Amino acid sequence: MEQPAPERRFEERDDYGNYEANLRFLREAGLAPGAGPLLEIGSGKGRMLDLLRREGYDARGVEVNAAMIDESRRLFGDLPIQKVDGATLPFADRAFATVVSFDVFEHIPDTDAHLHEVTRVLSPGGTYFLQTPNKWTNVVFETIRWRSFTAFRVDHCSLHSYREIKQRFAKHGFDTEFFDIPVVTDFFRWKVRRYLGWPGLAMLKVANPDKFPLALKTNFYVKASLAKPR
């Protein structure tokens, strides 16, 4: 199967991200307006950032692709999205109470450097809300999707398991809480049908990911909190 370039596949995350489930996660995890400045990493076309700002959040974003930023402004007006190279965040220490990212963590080659920067810009006791695919379930899907055991690694270079997420975040001073968010939405069924066909939909009825144990969920919804200094 012909594969789109890695940068193209990453840019499509805004269209193919599980938007409905991401919103539910933020609500259930207790992210409320008035909690202080919020940074979205990987704003894409600005859909989530626009919603957060309309709901009263003091939110801004960063994005690696200038064309995506231009598209966000065409769709939603002059959103406060800065272009960054992805390695560093152009903000002062302790600038944000909250950081969020969706379908971004798995694309970052050096997740330790990423978490170091997130920790730096978060205020003491701040929170990082993120959604990222499960390493074990995603590898199976992507192998079938691309008909290759290695092609997906170019794009999803930093997939993590449940245990690996807990360990990596703990190394940077985070306490992690995983949320059980249903993912079998209309978008999810569309994706299964597109890439796996009717057999995939039939398999979905037998093995519904929403019924899997937390460590085997197709996507991890993580609330990572920095400990407050004593």
What are the residue ranges of the model-derived segments?
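Surface-exposed beta-strand edges and their flanking turn/coil or helix-capping segments
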Residues: G56, N65, R74, A95-A97, ...
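A short His-aromatic
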Residues: D103-H107
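Generic C-terminal helix-cap and adjacent flexible tail
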Residues: A227-R230
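Conserved N-terminal segment of class I S-adenosyl-L-methionine
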Residues: M1-A92, T98-F102, L115, A215-F220
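S-adenosyl-L-methionine-dependent methyltransferase catalytic module, highlighting the catalytic core
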Residues: Q3-A21, R47, P109-E117, T127-S225
